[in-house]
């Protein structure tokens, strides 16, 4: 009888140990599931930096900085300027058609490094200081025209500043008019329209065009909106 009691106690102990092990395992699995669920939620909450439409819809402005370590593959143009290689074919087609229409456009500024963007910002601030503004005032005004480093579309290679070979005001005006009316056909949009400065955070720049893809560019053009409004 005493021996039977011992056996029963051993069986209970073994059974209890098994129950504890199984319980711990279930808790562990549940914890991992919860961690994975939380991780997935965090990723979804953080959002896709490329937007729902892929890389060409990446939103970059003072409220949406460039993703860390973003490094596009670049193509060098004839004048040494660089652009994201994926936009080059459509950019070239747009310029070819503009030339057929009597224009002579070229990319005055394409991809910029962080250091170059900082240099441009520093120069802009210094220029306003030389006009008598305080450093704080100069910085505030400069940021209306030059995006702070880390928030410029030029740093992702999808934006181009377009000028004319003949830099007279009339010729520049003609090419910008042509671009306003036709750039969407090639996947580009006027990025900083005159009536959207309160939304984009940047002053009107008739020379600054951004690649978003042909279908989306046409949607934006037809609706008369800016990229921020499209992505809402």
Go through the PLM ranges and name each one.
Residues 2-232:
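Extracytoplasmic cell-surface/polysaccharide-interacting catalytic and binding patches
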């Amino acid at each position: 009888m005493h021996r039977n009691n011992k056996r029963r106690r051993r069986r209970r102990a073994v059974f209890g140990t098994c129950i504890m092990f199984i319980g711990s395992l279930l808790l562990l699995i549940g914890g991992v599931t919860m961690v994975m669920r939380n991780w997935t939620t965090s990723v979804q909450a953080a959002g896709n930096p490329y937007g729902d439409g892929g890389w060409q819809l990446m939103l970059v402005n003072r409220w949406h900085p460039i993703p860390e370590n973003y490094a596009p593959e670049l193509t060098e143009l004839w004048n040494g300027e660089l652009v994201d290689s994926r936009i080059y074919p459509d950019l070239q087609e747009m310029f070819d058609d503009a030339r057929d229409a009597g224009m002579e456009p070229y990319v005055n500024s394409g991809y910029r490094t962080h250091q170059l963007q900082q240099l441009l910002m520093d120069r802009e601030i210094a220029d306003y200081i030389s006009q008598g503004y305080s450093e704080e005032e100069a910085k505030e005004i400069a940021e209306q025209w030059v995006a702070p480093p880390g928030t410029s579309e030029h740093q992702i290679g999808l934006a181009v500043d377009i000028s004319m070979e003949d830099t007279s005001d009339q010729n520049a005006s003609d090419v910008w008019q042509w671009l306003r009316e036709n750039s969407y056909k090639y996947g580009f949009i006027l990025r900083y329209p005159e009536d959207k400065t309160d939304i984009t955070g940047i002053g009107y720049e008739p020379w600054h065009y951004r690649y978003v893809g042909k279908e989306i560019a046409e949607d934006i053009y037809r609706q008369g909106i800016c990229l921020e409004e499209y992505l809402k």
